[in-house]
Regions:
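Zn-dependent metallo-beta-lactamase
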Residues: 1-56, 61-63
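Metallo-beta-lactamase
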Residues: 3, 75, 80-86, 90, ...
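Divalent metal-coordination and catalytic microenvironments
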Residues: 48, 58, 91, 98, ...
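Residue-level marker for buried hydrophobic side chains located in beta-strands
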Residues: 55-57, 95, 193-195
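Active-site metal-binding loops of divalent metal-dependent hydrolases
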Residues: 59-62, 99, 120-121, 176-178, ...
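Conserved small/polar residues in nucleotide/adenosyl-binding loops
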Residues: 212-218
Length: 222
C-alpha cells in the first residue's frame, strides 16, 4: 500500500445530495427481511480541495434516476458544490469508487475532469457478470457506456490496486460490494482520512451477522 507521513493542506467536504426513506432490511442486507424497517439512507459525494485543484470522489445520480429508483434528490450535486465555492469546471479529477448507479451518474457534469477507476471494476461492469440480474441490479447501462466513451476520449486513468491521484491522495482496491470497489486515503493537516465508500454502509455491516451487503470476496479487511 502506498503510504505517506507528510501532512498536506488537503481539505475534505461531504456533500449530501439525496436520500432514500422507508428502507427495509432487505434493502440493506442480502437475505434481509423485507418487512423489517431499516430507516433512511443518505447519499453523499466528497470534494477534496488540494493545493492544485479539486478532486471529487463519486458523481452520484440525477433527478431522473432518483425518480426511477424511488429516491429523493435534496439538491443537484452541482448546486451542492457551488455552496462550498466549487464550480464543476474546477474539478480536475474524479475518483469513481465503483460503477453503481449512485456513484457513477451525472457523467456529463464535469467536462474537464479525468476519471480514475480500477481495472477490474470496468471488467466487471462490462463482462459476463452483468448477465446475472442480481449482480447488475445496481448498475445502469448508460453510466457504464458513458465511462467507456470517456476511455475512448482519453479521459480515464485505470488503477490496478493501489494508486496515487495527487499529493496525499491515494486509492486502494477493496472489492466485496463490487469487484473493483476502491477506497480513498487522504492526508490532511489533522491526519489521514479514509473515504471507504460502500465498504460498509452501516455499523451493522461490521458485525458478525448471517447476512451482509457484499456480493463478492473482499480484497482486504477495512
Amino acid at each position: 500500500m502506498a503510504k505517506t507521513n507528510n501532512k498536506t493542506n488537503n481539505e475534505i467536504y461531504a456533500v449530501r445530495y439525496a436520500r432514500h426513506d422507508g428502507r427495509t432490511a432487505a434493502n440493506n442486507f442480502i437475505g434481509g427481511d423485507p418487512h423489517e424497517a431499516s430507516g433512511a439512507l443518505e447519499f453523499y459525494v466528497w470534494a477534496i480541495r488540494t493545493g492544485r485543484g479539486v478532486v471529487l470522489v463519486d458523481t452520484g445520480f440525477d433527478e431522473a434516476m432518483a425518480a426511477r429508483r424511488s429516491r429523493s434528490v435534496l439538491r443537484p450535486i452541482a448546486e451542492g458544490l457551488r455552496s462550498i465555492g466549487i464550480a464543476c469546471n474546477d474539478v480536475s479529477d474524479v475518483i469513481v469508487s465503483h460503477l453503481h448507479y449512485d456513484h457513477a451518474g451525472n457523467y456529463d457534469v464535469f467536462p474537464g475532469a479525468r476519471y480514475h477507476l480500477q481495472d477490474c471494476e470496468m471488467e466487471f461492469a462490462t463482462g459476463r457478470c452483468m448477465c446475472d440480474a442480481a449482480k447488475r441490479v445496481a448498475f445502469e447501462a448508460d453510466d457504464v457506456t458513458a465511462m467507456v466513451r470517456k476511455v475512448f476520449a482519453d479521459r480515464v486513468t485505470f488503477h490496478d490496486g493501489d494508486g496515487a491521484i495527487a499529493p496525499g491522495i491515494t486509492v486502494h482496491r477493496i472489492g466485496g460490494h463490487s469487484k473493483g470497489l476502491q477506497s480513498v486515503r487522504v492526508e490532511t493537516e489533522r491526519g489521514p482520512v479514509v473515504l471507504a465508500s460502500d465498504a460498509s454502509h452501516l455499523y451493522a455491516h461490521l458485525e458478525p451477522v448471517s447476512y451482509t451487503h457484499l456480493t463478492l470476496p473482499t480484497n482486504r479487511e477495512v
